Structures are given as C-alpha cells and as structure tokens.
Amino acid sequence: MKTSPRHQCRASEPGTTRRTEDEVIVGVPTEIKTEEYRVAITPVGVRELTAHGHRVLIQTGAGAGSSIDDASFAAVGAEIVPGAGDVFAAADMVLKVKEPQPSEIAMLRPGQVLFTYLHLAAYPAEAQGLIDSGATAIAYETVELPSGALPLLAPMSEIAGRMAAQAGAHHLERPAGGRGLLIGGV
C-alpha cells in the first residue's frame, strides 16, 4: 500500500515515526488571548481521541489556567510538547478556545483544520489571514443541529447570562464604586 504524504510522519512530529492511515494528529496550544484561561480539551476528551487511534499534542501548560496540569493530559495519552510552534507544525487539526491571534495565524498551513470560536466580524485582518493561510477554519458558534440549535454556543450563552448577574452584583458593592447594595435585599 502506498502512503500519501498526508499519512507520512513529518520530521517535526514528536513521538512515534509511523502513522496509520486513519490517524489524525490533534493539537492544542496554550491560549494566548488576554484574560483567556480555558483550554480547548479536557483529559476526558484526550482519552476519547487516543482510544480511537488519534494522537493528541498538548502544549506545555495549556491547561494551567483551567487547573489541569500536564501530567493529567499525559496520563490519558497526550504528548506534551514545548511550544505552540510544535503543535501547529505537527497537527492536522488545531483545537483552540478563542480566535487565533496574528502569531498563530502565521503558523497555520494549507490543509490544516482549525476548530475554535472565531467571532471574526470584529477582526477583518484576522479573517483575511485565515483565508490566506489555506487552512480550513470551523467556528464553534456556527455548528448547527438539524433542529437549528447551536449546541456549542448555547452553553457559553448560559454562562454569560449567569456571569452578568454576578458581575452586576460586584459593581453594586461599595469597594467596587457602587452604592453598597445587595441583590435581593437584606
């Protein structure tokens, strides 16, 4: 059987040198957008992917903001790699939480898949950069069920709604410059 270039191991890939035809290398870099602490996958997700024959590369410290250490990812089969460049160079699919920053867009390549929240309307230069990269970008917020439901956007909307009340309550406190009011009364 001839192996296509897509299925050959690239020199920059950590770990094994042989690749199966159906294996996908999934990469997860550390989020670099200001005030973003989430990670695009949990150890449970890594275990599921590796159980189905895929490789998962996690950048060192990618889960730290979510209180997930590298050892937790490695314990379920992830390969921990030192930098974002290692993730982008080897991964067929890159998973992120937020839209890629310009330095990340520069690392994307034709044929690579990026799966993340994009929200590109506010970022025309980044949108053009994604087009120019030749990568396929899939926005979480556009994944739609036949019913029209947006299963990847709904949980974020619910969290935002709950956080709005909490943030509002904080700003009513005197130390935050508010009038010292309590939501719900005393």
Residue spans for each PLM region:
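Glycine/serine-rich phosphate-binding loop and adjoining beta1-alpha1 elements at the start
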Residues: 2-5, 11-25, 31, 102-186
